[in-house]
Amino acid sequence: MTTQIRPFTTQSEALFARAQAVTPGGVNSPVRAFRSVGGTPRFIREAHGAYLTDMDGHRLLDYIGSWGPMILGHDHPAVREAVAAALDRGTSFGAPSEGEVRLAETVTRLTGVDRVRFVNSGTEATMSALRLARGFTGRTFIVKFRGNYHGHADGLLVEAGSGLMTNAAKTLGQAAPSSAGVPEEYARLTLVCEYNDPAALGALMQERGHDVAAVIFEPVVGNAGVLIPTPEFLAALHRVRDAGALLIADEVMTGFRLSLRGATGLLGLTPDLICWGKIIGGGLPVGAYGGRAEVMDFVSPQGPVYQAGTLSGNPLAMAAGLATLEVLESDPSIYARLETYTMQLAEGLRAAAQAAGVPLSVNQIGSMLTAFHQDAPVGSIRTYADAARSDTGAFAVWFQRMLAQGIYWAPSQFESIFVSAAHTDSDLNATLDAAHSAYAQLGGTA
């Protein structure tokens, strides 16, 4: 059974006040501020396995996993040992190292791409991939999908998901920038289509395909909540290359999470370029993009498309990423265990909400899950517009009641949660006990 955690958050409150004096909003990424759920964000002191400990000593069962990278759980021995060994050799060289070669060899072998280039974040990866696509094709326009989030490069902050979801929902149907500071001129170079609408994508490519350098997409959406592609939509994605456009899969979130070949391998997709992040750094800052040699050889110094980075291929990140992938590859049962746990979590959440009379629709694939607080049949939430109908107020109340019982869920209705290999059956039972209590209170049946 879960127990009510101590209500005080004195240390987090004090740190948040200090942070707001020196950092915009008191955080270094907006969703961490708890703006959509209320209350004080928890400042974390340490993390081990499936648990965080905040500055007030509260132990929290973690379903964020640093927003996806911690697929093995926090402080995994193999990752810790690899980083410690790398640290003994130095933190940054500004020169090539064996670690980046070994990780590149592993990524290419597991995913089937010919070449890979490491950068420092998912945003850098998608930004660089789009520049490469434009350089390779000689075209200007890109196509993205409403609610897909590809980082915060200007040209991609158009009808974006993630922390922009609430504001962007107000301009549904308009291809407008999702952030102040993004010039309309940039936004006009981004053509927006509805995710999971193959007819709309086909019509757009028929009309504008000759101008399109690339179509970028999340093979499984995670930042509008989890949205799973239909077979018809996947087929339409393959056809965009008939117009000479490149197909770019943003696997920053799904890469090595849904399978060793990511979502593209799981779904049978063969994009021209793939972007990665999160898991390939084992919890340290990283990004990468890769693809077939013909395209990747356009990247400097081999080709004319410039991209560089002082800390790209950082030896600590390379060591952590390589250790993570080695563990995943050495134990093929990990992915099956992750999926079983997450399916049971989804089923348990549905049952808890139903018992309390609370509307809930859960989307789940592999170890990714979103509990949409709305009345919709299972599997019917497939688009940005579908997700945007969720009751964010009900979610906020539920989130706080889960947090009060020591369950650390993503503090946004429009995010995926992530299950790790460190989660146990006992953790699952504790989570579902908490969910039954939270939904009973929300539905007035407690």
UniProtKB/Swiss-Prot annotation:
> To which pathway does this protein belong?
Porphyrin-containing compound metabolism; protoporphyrin-IX biosynthesis; 5-aminolevulinate from L-glutamyl-tRNA(Glu): step 2/2
- Give the domain of life: Bacteria
Enzyme Commission designation: 5.4.3.8
Q: Which residues carry this modification: N6-(pyridoxal phosphate)lysine?
A: 278
Where, per UniProt, does this protein localize?
A: Cytoplasm
**Main location class:** cytoplasm
Q: What class of enzyme is it?
A: isomerase
Cofactor or coenzyme needed: pyridoxal 5'-phosphate
Name the Gene Ontology molecular function terms of this record: glutamate-1-semialdehyde 2,1-aminomutase activity; pyridoxal phosphate binding; transaminase activity
Q: Name one Pfam family in it.
A: Aminotran_3
Any one Gene Ontology biological process term?
protoporphyrinogen IX biosynthetic process
What reactions does this protein catalyze?
A: (S)-4-amino-5-oxopentanoate = 5-aminolevulinate
- UniProt GO cellular component terms: cytoplasm
Q: Which residues form a coiled coil?
A: none
* Gene3D superfamilies, A to Z: Aspartate Aminotransferase, domain 1, Type I PLP-dependent aspartate aminotransferase-like (Major domain)
Q: Which NCBIfam families match?
A: hemL, PRK00062.1
Subunit organization = Homodimer.
In Swiss-Prot or TrEMBL terms, this protein is called Glutamate-1-semialdehyde 2,1-aminomutase
Native organism: Deinococcus geothermalis (strain DSM 11300 / CIP 105573 / AG-3a)
